[in-house]
UniProtKB/Swiss-Prot annotation:
Chief place of localization: cytoplasm
Listed InterPro entries: DDH_dom, DHH_sf, DHHA2, DHHA2_dom_sf, Mn-dep_inorganic_PyrPase, Oligoribo/pAp-PDE_c-di-AMP_PDE
Compartments where found: Cytoplasm
Binding site for Mn(2+) 2: D15, D77, H99, D151
Record's catalysed reaction(s): diphosphate + H2O = 2 phosphate + H(+)
GO molecular-function terms, A-Z: inorganic diphosphate phosphatase activity; manganese ion binding
Source species: Streptococcus equi subsp. zooepidemicus (strain MGCS10565)
Name of this chain's protein: Probable manganese-dependent inorganic pyrophosphatase
EC number: 3.6.1.1
Protein backbone atom coordinates (compact mmCIF):
# COMPACT_ATOMS: atom_id res chain seq x y z
CA UNK A 1 0.00 0.00 0.00
CA UNK A 2 1.23 3.50 -0.84
CA UNK A 3 1.27 6.27 1.72
CA UNK A 4 -2.14 6.99 3.25
CA UNK A 5 -3.31 10.58 3.02
CA UNK A 6 -5.37 11.81 5.98
CA UNK A 7 -7.55 14.87 5.47
CA UNK A 8 -10.75 16.66 6.40
CA UNK A 9 -13.32 18.15 4.03
CA UNK A 10 -13.01 20.90 1.44
CA UNK A 11 -12.94 24.45 2.84
CA UNK A 12 -11.53 22.98 6.05
CA UNK A 13 -12.69 24.36 9.37
CA UNK A 14 -10.86 23.95 12.66
CA UNK A 15 -12.33 20.51 13.39
CA UNK A 16 -11.34 19.22 9.94
CA UNK A 17 -7.74 20.34 10.38
CA UNK A 18 -7.48 19.31 14.04
CA UNK A 19 -9.03 15.87 13.70
CA UNK A 20 -6.94 14.95 10.66
CA UNK A 21 -3.71 16.23 12.22
CA UNK A 22 -4.35 14.30 15.43
CA UNK A 23 -5.49 11.12 13.69
CA UNK A 24 -2.36 11.15 11.54
CA UNK A 25 -0.28 11.14 14.74
CA UNK A 26 -2.41 8.38 16.26
CA UNK A 27 -2.28 6.25 13.09
CA UNK A 28 1.50 6.21 13.25
CA UNK A 29 1.72 5.54 16.99
CA UNK A 30 -1.09 3.04 17.50
CA UNK A 31 -1.66 1.42 14.12
CA UNK A 32 1.82 1.61 12.54
CA UNK A 33 0.41 3.17 9.38
CA UNK A 34 2.44 5.20 6.89
CA UNK A 35 0.24 8.29 6.85
CA UNK A 36 0.59 11.95 5.96
CA UNK A 37 -1.84 14.65 7.04
CA UNK A 38 -2.81 17.07 4.28
CA UNK A 39 -5.62 19.57 3.80
CA UNK A 40 -8.06 20.37 1.02
CA UNK A 41 -7.67 24.11 1.52
CA UNK A 42 -5.90 26.77 3.53
CA UNK A 43 -6.82 27.26 7.20
CA UNK A 44 -9.30 30.02 7.99
CA UNK A 45 -8.46 32.75 10.50
CA UNK A 46 -9.93 30.84 13.42
CA UNK A 47 -7.91 27.74 12.57
CA UNK A 48 -4.79 29.83 11.96
CA UNK A 49 -5.19 31.26 15.47
CA UNK A 50 -5.27 27.75 16.96
CA UNK A 51 -2.31 26.52 14.89
CA UNK A 52 -0.24 29.54 15.84
CA UNK A 53 -1.21 29.34 19.52
CA UNK A 54 -0.02 25.75 19.80
CA UNK A 55 2.96 26.10 17.46
CA UNK A 56 1.73 23.76 14.75
CA UNK A 57 2.38 24.24 11.03
CA UNK A 58 -0.62 24.03 8.73
CA UNK A 59 -0.82 20.81 6.70
CA UNK A 60 0.17 21.21 3.07
CA UNK A 61 -2.73 21.67 0.66
CA UNK A 62 -3.46 19.06 -2.01
CA UNK A 63 -6.14 18.83 -4.68
CA UNK A 64 -5.72 15.24 -5.90
CA UNK A 65 -4.81 12.05 -4.07
CA UNK A 66 -3.55 10.25 -7.17
CA UNK A 67 -1.32 13.19 -8.05
CA UNK A 68 0.33 12.64 -4.67
CA UNK A 69 0.89 8.97 -5.45
CA UNK A 70 -1.75 7.86 -2.94
CA UNK A 71 -4.18 5.05 -3.67
CA UNK A 72 -5.76 4.98 -0.18
CA UNK A 73 -7.13 7.80 1.98
CA UNK A 74 -8.51 8.35 5.46
CA UNK A 75 -11.28 10.91 5.88
CA UNK A 76 -11.98 12.89 9.03
CA UNK A 77 -14.90 15.21 9.75
CA UNK A 78 -16.75 14.16 6.59
CA UNK A 79 -17.81 11.17 4.54
CA UNK A 80 -19.90 12.59 1.68
CA UNK A 81 -17.97 12.39 -1.59
CA UNK A 82 -19.05 15.86 -2.88
CA UNK A 83 -17.28 17.36 0.16
CA UNK A 84 -14.07 15.38 -0.30
CA UNK A 85 -11.00 15.40 -2.52
CA UNK A 86 -11.57 15.80 -6.26
CA UNK A 87 -10.64 12.22 -7.18
CA UNK A 88 -12.23 10.50 -4.18
CA UNK A 89 -14.02 7.98 -6.44
CA UNK A 90 -10.70 6.92 -7.97
CA UNK A 91 -9.00 5.92 -4.71
CA UNK A 92 -9.89 3.56 -1.88
CA UNK A 93 -11.26 4.93 1.37
CA UNK A 94 -9.28 3.12 4.05
CA UNK A 95 -11.03 4.70 7.02
CA UNK A 96 -13.39 7.40 8.25
CA UNK A 97 -13.74 9.26 11.55
CA UNK A 98 -16.79 11.50 11.47
CA UNK A 99 -19.75 12.94 13.36
CA UNK A 100 -22.08 13.85 10.48
CA UNK A 101 -24.83 12.05 8.61
CA UNK A 102 -23.67 9.27 6.28
CA UNK A 103 -24.75 10.01 2.72
CA UNK A 104 -23.58 10.10 -0.92
CA UNK A 105 -20.94 7.58 0.01
CA UNK A 106 -20.04 4.02 -0.95
CA UNK A 107 -16.95 1.82 -1.05
CA UNK A 108 -15.98 -1.30 -2.94
CA UNK A 109 -14.31 -2.86 0.09
CA UNK A 110 -14.80 -2.95 3.87
CA UNK A 111 -13.20 -0.12 5.81
CA UNK A 112 -12.56 1.21 9.28
CA UNK A 113 -15.42 3.58 10.13
CA UNK A 114 -16.00 5.42 13.39
CA UNK A 115 -19.06 7.68 13.34
CA UNK A 116 -20.58 9.06 16.53
CA UNK A 117 -23.29 11.70 17.16
CA UNK A 118 -21.01 13.95 19.18
CA UNK A 119 -20.04 17.60 18.89
CA UNK A 120 -16.91 17.19 16.80
CA UNK A 121 -14.70 14.70 15.01
CA UNK A 122 -11.99 15.87 17.40
CA UNK A 123 -14.00 14.42 20.28
CA UNK A 124 -13.91 11.00 18.63
CA UNK A 125 -10.19 11.17 17.87
CA UNK A 126 -9.48 12.05 21.51
CA UNK A 127 -11.49 9.01 22.57
CA UNK A 128 -9.42 6.87 20.19
CA UNK A 129 -6.22 8.13 21.84
CA UNK A 130 -7.55 6.98 25.20
CA UNK A 131 -8.82 3.65 23.91
CA UNK A 132 -5.42 2.88 22.39
CA UNK A 133 -3.52 4.15 25.45
CA UNK A 134 -1.59 6.75 23.48
CA UNK A 135 -0.56 9.89 25.35
CA UNK A 136 -1.88 13.11 23.84
CA UNK A 137 0.90 15.68 23.30
CA UNK A 138 0.16 19.24 24.43
CA UNK A 139 -0.06 20.66 20.91
CA UNK A 140 -2.42 17.93 19.73
CA UNK A 141 -4.57 18.33 22.84
CA UNK A 142 -4.79 22.02 22.01
CA UNK A 143 -5.84 21.35 18.44
CA UNK A 144 -8.43 18.77 19.46
CA UNK A 145 -9.83 21.20 22.01
CA UNK A 146 -9.95 23.87 19.31
CA UNK A 147 -11.86 21.57 16.96
CA UNK A 148 -14.41 20.82 19.66
CA UNK A 149 -14.80 24.48 20.63
CA UNK A 150 -15.22 25.49 17.00
CA UNK A 151 -17.88 22.95 16.11
CA UNK A 152 -19.90 23.45 19.30
CA UNK A 153 -19.40 27.22 19.66
CA UNK A 154 -17.76 26.70 23.03
CA UNK A 155 -20.22 23.93 24.01
CA UNK A 156 -23.29 26.12 23.36
CA UNK A 157 -24.47 24.48 20.14
CA UNK A 158 -27.30 21.90 20.26
CA UNK A 159 -24.86 19.49 18.63
CA UNK A 160 -22.91 19.36 21.90
CA UNK A 161 -23.02 15.85 23.36
CA UNK A 162 -23.08 15.29 27.11
CA UNK A 163 -19.64 13.68 26.87
CA UNK A 164 -18.17 16.73 25.12
CA UNK A 165 -18.14 18.76 28.34
CA UNK A 166 -15.85 16.24 30.01
CA UNK A 167 -13.71 15.95 26.89
CA UNK A 168 -13.28 19.73 26.78
CA UNK A 169 -12.20 19.92 30.42
CA UNK A 170 -9.68 17.10 29.97
CA UNK A 171 -8.24 18.55 26.77
CA UNK A 172 -7.98 22.04 28.26
CA UNK A 173 -5.95 20.60 31.13
CA UNK A 174 -3.68 18.68 28.75
CA UNK A 175 -3.25 21.78 26.58
CA UNK A 176 -2.58 24.04 29.55
CA UNK A 177 -5.28 26.61 28.76
CA UNK A 178 -8.35 28.04 30.46
CA UNK A 179 -11.32 26.68 28.52
CA UNK A 180 -13.57 29.77 28.43
CA UNK A 181 -10.78 32.29 27.97
CA UNK A 182 -9.03 30.43 25.17
CA UNK A 183 -12.29 29.39 23.52
CA UNK A 184 -13.70 32.90 23.24
CA UNK A 185 -10.39 34.27 21.94
CA UNK A 186 -10.28 31.60 19.24
CA UNK A 187 -13.90 32.09 18.18
CA UNK A 188 -13.49 35.86 17.97
CA UNK A 189 -10.43 35.39 15.76
CA UNK A 190 -12.74 33.76 13.24
CA UNK A 191 -15.22 36.64 13.12
CA UNK A 192 -12.93 39.12 11.38
CA UNK A 193 -14.80 39.33 8.10
CA UNK A 194 -13.90 42.88 7.07
CA UNK A 195 -10.77 41.78 5.22
CA UNK A 196 -12.64 39.11 3.25
CA UNK A 197 -14.05 39.69 -0.21
CA UNK A 198 -17.64 38.59 -0.72
CA UNK A 199 -16.43 35.59 -2.74
CA UNK A 200 -14.13 34.60 0.12
CA UNK A 201 -16.80 35.20 2.74
CA UNK A 202 -19.30 32.78 1.20
CA UNK A 203 -16.60 30.12 0.83
CA UNK A 204 -15.02 30.29 4.32
CA UNK A 205 -17.06 27.35 5.61
CA UNK A 206 -19.21 25.93 2.83
CA UNK A 207 -20.36 22.42 2.00
CA UNK A 208 -22.33 20.97 -0.90
CA UNK A 209 -25.22 18.59 -0.26
CA UNK A 210 -26.97 16.47 -2.87
CA UNK A 211 -30.65 16.79 -1.99
CA UNK A 212 -33.02 14.88 -4.24
CA UNK A 213 -31.04 15.71 -7.36
CA UNK A 214 -30.27 19.27 -6.32
CA UNK A 215 -26.77 20.51 -5.54
CA UNK A 216 -27.40 22.71 -2.51
CA UNK A 217 -24.52 24.77 -1.15
CA UNK A 218 -24.80 25.60 2.56
CA UNK A 219 -22.29 28.10 3.92
CA UNK A 220 -21.81 29.59 7.37
CA UNK A 221 -19.97 32.61 8.69
CA UNK A 222 -19.59 33.53 12.35
CA UNK A 223 -19.86 37.12 13.52
CA UNK A 224 -20.56 39.27 16.55
CA UNK A 225 -22.70 41.65 14.46
CA UNK A 226 -25.17 40.26 11.90
CA UNK A 227 -26.21 43.76 10.81
CA UNK A 228 -22.63 44.54 9.82
CA UNK A 229 -22.56 41.54 7.49
CA UNK A 230 -25.95 42.42 6.00
CA UNK A 231 -24.60 45.84 5.05
CA UNK A 232 -22.75 43.91 2.33
CA UNK A 233 -25.87 42.00 1.26
CA UNK A 234 -26.01 43.24 -2.33
CA UNK A 235 -22.37 42.33 -2.99
CA UNK A 236 -22.77 39.00 -1.19
CA UNK A 237 -25.77 38.14 -3.37
CA UNK A 238 -23.77 38.98 -6.49
CA UNK A 239 -20.99 36.63 -5.35
CA UNK A 240 -23.53 33.89 -4.62
CA UNK A 241 -25.11 34.22 -8.08
CA UNK A 242 -21.69 34.05 -9.70
CA UNK A 243 -20.64 30.88 -7.90
CA UNK A 244 -24.05 29.26 -8.50
CA UNK A 245 -23.62 29.84 -12.22
CA UNK A 246 -20.03 28.62 -12.34
CA UNK A 247 -20.47 25.55 -10.12
CA UNK A 248 -24.01 24.53 -11.04
CA UNK A 249 -25.58 24.85 -7.60
CA UNK A 250 -29.37 24.88 -7.67
CA UNK A 251 -29.57 26.72 -4.36
CA UNK A 252 -27.30 28.57 -1.97
CA UNK A 253 -28.07 29.00 1.73
CA UNK A 254 -25.83 31.25 3.83
CA UNK A 255 -26.01 31.16 7.63
CA UNK A 256 -24.82 34.39 9.23
CA UNK A 257 -24.37 33.27 12.83
CA UNK A 258 -24.16 35.53 15.88
CA UNK A 259 -21.81 33.62 18.20
CA UNK A 260 -22.65 35.84 21.19
CA UNK A 261 -26.45 35.63 21.11
CA UNK A 262 -26.71 32.23 19.37
CA UNK A 263 -28.97 33.23 16.47
CA UNK A 264 -28.61 33.25 12.69
CA UNK A 265 -29.82 35.20 9.70
CA UNK A 266 -30.46 33.05 6.64
CA UNK A 267 -29.67 34.52 3.23
CA UNK A 268 -30.85 32.25 0.43
CA UNK A 269 -30.97 32.28 -3.36
CA UNK A 270 -31.90 29.65 -5.91
CA UNK A 271 -34.53 27.60 -7.66
CA UNK A 272 -36.17 26.09 -4.59
CA UNK A 273 -36.85 28.95 -2.21
CA UNK A 274 -40.28 27.51 -1.43
CA UNK A 275 -38.55 24.45 -0.03
CA UNK A 276 -36.15 26.62 1.99
CA UNK A 277 -39.09 28.52 3.47
CA UNK A 278 -40.88 25.28 4.31
CA UNK A 279 -37.74 23.87 5.91
CA UNK A 280 -37.52 26.68 8.44
CA UNK A 281 -41.18 27.72 8.62
CA UNK A 282 -40.39 31.31 7.76
CA UNK A 283 -40.93 33.76 4.91
CA UNK A 284 -37.92 35.13 3.09
CA UNK A 285 -38.10 38.87 2.65
CA UNK A 286 -35.62 40.32 0.18
CA UNK A 287 -33.94 36.88 0.19
CA UNK A 288 -33.29 36.69 3.93
CA UNK A 289 -34.98 35.83 7.24
CA UNK A 290 -34.09 35.54 10.92
CA UNK A 291 -33.73 32.06 12.44
CA UNK A 292 -33.81 32.30 16.22
CA UNK A 293 -31.56 29.96 18.18
CA UNK A 294 -29.93 28.47 15.09
CA UNK A 295 -26.17 28.03 15.27
CA UNK A 296 -25.60 24.54 13.86
CA UNK A 297 -25.62 23.75 10.16
CA UNK A 298 -25.40 20.04 10.93
CA UNK A 299 -28.40 19.88 13.27
CA UNK A 300 -30.53 22.95 12.60
CA UNK A 301 -30.21 23.50 8.86
CA UNK A 302 -29.18 20.45 6.83
CA UNK A 303 -31.72 17.96 8.30
CA UNK A 304 -34.54 20.46 7.76
CA UNK A 305 -33.47 21.10 4.18
CA UNK A 306 -33.10 17.38 3.56
CA UNK A 307 -36.66 16.74 4.71
CA UNK A 308 -38.10 19.67 2.78
CA UNK A 309 -36.33 18.72 -0.44
CA UNK A 310 -37.59 15.16 -0.01
CA UNK A 311 -34.06 13.79 -0.15
Amino acid sequence: MSKLLVFGHQNPDTDAIASSYAFDYLAKKAFDLDTEVVALGDPNEETAFALDYFGVSAPRVVTSAKAEGASHVILTDHNEFPQSISDIREVEVYGIVDHHRVANFETANPLYMRVEPVGSASSIVYRLFKENRVDVPKDIAGLLLSGLISDTLLLKSPTTHASDHRVAVELAELAGVKLEEYGMAMLKAGTNLASKSEAELIDIDAKTFELNGNAVRVAQVNTVDIAEVLERKEAIEAAIKEVMASEGYSDFVLMITDIVNSNSEILALGANMDKVETAFDFKLEDNHAFLAGAVSRKKQVVPQLTESFGA
